[in-house]
Amino acid sequence: MKPVLQYRVVPRLPESLSALQDLAHNLWWAWNHEALGVFRRLSPEGWDRSGHNPVQMLGALRQHELEEAAADEGFQNHLRRVMSDLENYLHKPRWYQREHGGDGQPLFAYFSAEFGLTECVPIYSGGLGILAGDHLKSASDLGVPLVGLGLLYQEGYFRQYLNPDGWQQESYPDNDFYNQPLALAREAAGNEQRIHVQIGGETVAARIWRAQVGRVPLYLLDANIPDNSPAAQSITGRLYGGDQEMRIQQEILLGFGGYRALRQLGLNPRVYHMNEGHSAFLALERIRHAREAHQLG
């Protein structure tokens, strides 16, 4: 039986700690030691239990722990200092602004099948993802007007462990996107932003999630929604999972769907970078759009 209603019960953040939510939802903390220190200081045990996930940790702390932090002047000063650093980081001119002028809308788009940003958003397997994640972080530090585009995998990449007999086994932990530093992209009316792509004779819908990586937005497509068939839902099930057909379906969604997502969000980059061949269908979608826009035969 499907649930009629789902809801989450979380403690109420004291007003003086409300900035923790903003900090938790900007992945700048993942490469800033002072920001990391805020969460470790708030609850060392909670930080470790959450797998270094500040969003999950804030939802799991007891109310009295939050009240104690709110009454701790040393912690309050630490939080204020970090939030001031973040404010300056986000709004003061950096290298790109000093060399090339204002921000404008993103001029460069970075497409990748995986992004290794932090362990609490496990949608990467190794070097390719770490490279993509570091690319976004470096662009943020430099002030480069970049936007990232990828897929949001329900189970990510497999985890390895040894069973009692010493044999290597694999598991696919389920990702809870609502307890990760992610947010759904929404229209002005509050409805979810969605794109649609024709894949294998079926119209596949995907909603758009956003992760804020310092100054850089990263948009991730998620096909695991009730409107899709079970087969379509599985397209964003596992990173590099399934057979060759599944891989092609993922690449179609990334290339065609990623371009449509940016257009729907009002973004029109001048330069598109494809991290290896996984987003090769992006080139075909750009050609299709150019033919229609310029009425080419």
Model-predicted segments: where are they?
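Catalytic cores of carbohydrate-active enzymes across secretory and cytosolic contexts
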Residues: M1-G297
